[in-house]
Design a protein with these regions (language model features):
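Cofactor-binding beta-sheet edge motifs in enzyme active sites
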Residues: 1-111
């Protein structure tokens, strides 16, 4: 997986890379498995035995490119979270020709 981030002057590139990797991991887990279901008014997934998360052995290698900039540092936040679902959906479309429009993908039987 490859990502790029433009956050102004990179004060600490290692922290920026770690933040992007973590955001991508969180977003990927949510896109693949993040279903929350209710039964009789209660959440069925009460702990990690019933709520699937992305495990470390399923985390892809992430290459982080920091865009060189002379702008003031802006902070990194979680920019890796939001685009990962659409990126995976587009990759699946490129591979299969089928559009996936429901998240998590596991809810549609495609994860």
């Amino acid at each position: 997986m490859i990502c790029a981030v433009d956050c102004g002057v990179a004060v600490n590139p290692d922290v920026i890379a770690a933040q992007m990797e973590g955001g991508i991991g969180f977003g990927l887990g949510a896109a693949l498995y993040g279903a929350i279901t209710l039964k009789d008014g209660h959440v069925e997934q009460s702990n990690f035995d019933s709520y699937q998360v992305l495990r470390i052995d399923k985390m892809p290698k992430v290459e982080v490119y920091i865009v060189p900039s002379t702008e003031a540092p802006t902070g990194v936040g979680e920019p890796g979270v939001a685009p990962i679902g659409p990126a995976v959906a587009n990759a699946a479309f490129a591979a299969t020709g089928k559009r996936h429009r429901v998240l998590p993908f596991s809810a549609a039987g495609t994860a």
